[in-house]
């Protein structure tokens, strides 16, 4: 490669959405659902070209006649054939870039199994012939995008939540906590409590409607019990939502009962600790000398931290748990839905990062296990 730096492609593979674009941009060019849809009844789709699978938005718009599958569950790839379809769609249809001409930066969940990183590496070099690639931990990228190298990231997306303490740019694996409770669980919980109100949402297509209701109307109460009392006495918190068929439904205390499950997982029948306790426990697992830096830099990341009131409530609940002299600061960047991608864009355009790429030569020499030596 000459002196001219070829732009890298940055792909953040989330359980819910793929965020993809070009290094150096300040936002992803393409955001689409991580879905592969296949016809329920092959052969009866009149006027549609015989495609065996649809990816992303196209799968979303034809969802009535398709079975939708998410190849990434709880942040980790479980179906590699579908994942390859998603990557193919990302490069050729969304970014319209030839992967063999660009280095590719991919993201992974914290504590991603070793075999998974190797598989990602193998597919990039062997199926897509990339010249170079790198796999970065999602939470670390979010921290970079907030302009920090030390802090604790609470990253909550569609499939999984993690608290990841990071010191001088390195994640501390022994203190990472994983919570299998995220956006998809909240969508399912909202379906359930709307059912109790008499609104029956059940199909995979209707689930997408409920996800939209959740994103538009839900918020986090500063004090849940008070909010419940208030909602019983007045109808101020009721909001209406228009369904695709024109019917209008009313959503009341479901608006804050749904995301409350982040703080009280028992609502979902889970025994886990809430996000406030998980963050606190993660910090407690770190060396006593760095805790002050972590408490003062709690950085939110991911779509499930976007509810109004998240930052305030987290500050209040962690302050209650932490030593009384400790200064607690929760940082909620406005672009946190995309902060993993933005961090990847920043990292892969740094001149100092250019020697970090795994090159095709290195891969050919060492095989997929090279990823453990070069990406950490």
From Swiss-Prot:
Which family does the similarity line name?
Belongs to the actin family.
Q: Which UniProt keywords apply?
A: ATP-binding, Cytoplasm, Cytoskeleton, Hydrolase, Nucleotide-binding, Nucleus
Q: What else is known?
A: A potassium ion appears to reside in the active site during hydrolysis and leaves together with the inorganic phosphate Pi. K(+) does not activate Pi release; however, it may be relevant for ATP hydrolysis.
Q: What is this protein called?
A: Actin-1
Q: What is its EC number?
A: 3.6.4.-
Q: Name one GO biological process term.
A: symbiont-mediated actin polymerization-dependent cell-to-cell migration in host
Broad EC category: hydrolase
Spell out the subunit comment: Monomer (G-actin). Oligomer (F-actin). Polymerization of globular actin (G-actin) leads to a structural filament (F-actin) in the form of a two-stranded helix. Unlike for mammalian monomeric actin, parasite monomeric actin is able to induce oligomerization in the presence of ATP or ADP. Mg(2+), which is used to coordinate ATP, is required for polymerization. Interacts with MyoA. Interacts with DNase I with low affinity.
Source species of the chain: Plasmodium falciparum (isolate NF54)
One GO MF term on file is: structural constituent of cytoskeleton
């Amino acid at each position: 490669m000459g002196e001219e730096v070829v732009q890298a492609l940055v792909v953040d593979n989330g359980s819910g959405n793929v965020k993809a674009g070009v290094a150096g941009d300040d936002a992803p060019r393409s955001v689409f659902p991580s879905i592969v849809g296949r016809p329920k009844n092959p052969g009866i789709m009149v006027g549609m070209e015989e495609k065996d699978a649809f990816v992303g938005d196209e799968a979303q718009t034809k969802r009535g006649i398709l079975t939708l599958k998410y190849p990434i569950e709880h942040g980790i790839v479980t179906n590699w054939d579908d994942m390859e379809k998603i990557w193919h769609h990302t490069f050729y249809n969304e970014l319209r870039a030839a992967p063999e001409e660009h280095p590719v930066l991919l993201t992974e969940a914290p504590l991603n199994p070793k075999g998974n990183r190797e598989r990602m590496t193998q597919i990039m070099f062997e199926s897509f012939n990339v010249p170079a690639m790198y796999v970065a931990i999602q939470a670390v990228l979010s921290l970079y995008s907030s302009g920090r190298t030390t802090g604790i990231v609470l990253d909550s997306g569609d499939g999984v939540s993690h608290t990841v303490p990071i010191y001088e740019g390195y994640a501390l694996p022994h203190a990472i906590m994983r919570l299998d409770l995220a956006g998809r669980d909240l969508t399912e919980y909202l379906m359930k409590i709307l059912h109790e109100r008499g609104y029956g949402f059940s199909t995979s297509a209707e689930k997408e409607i409920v996800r939209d209701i959740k994103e538009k109307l839900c918020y986090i109460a500063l004090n849940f019990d008070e909010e419940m009392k208030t909602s019983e006495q007045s109808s101020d918190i009721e909001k209406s939502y228009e369904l695709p068929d024109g019917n209008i439904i009313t959503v009341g205390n479901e608006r804050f009962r749904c995301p409350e499950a982040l703080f009280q997982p028992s609502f979902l029948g889970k025994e886990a600790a809430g996000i406030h306790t998980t963050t606190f426990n993660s910090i407690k697992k770190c060396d006593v000398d760095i805790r002050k830096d972590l408490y003062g830099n709690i950085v939110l990341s991911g779509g499930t931290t976007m509810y109004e009131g998240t930052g305030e409530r987290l500050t209040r609940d962690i302050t209650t748990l932490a030593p009384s002299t400790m200064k607690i600061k929760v940082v909620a960047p406005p672009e946190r839905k995309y902060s993993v991608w933005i961090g990847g864009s920043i990292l892969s355009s740094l001149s100092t990062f250019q020697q970090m790429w795994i090159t095709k030569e290195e891969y050919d020499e060492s095989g997929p296990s090279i990823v453990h030596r070069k990406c950490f």
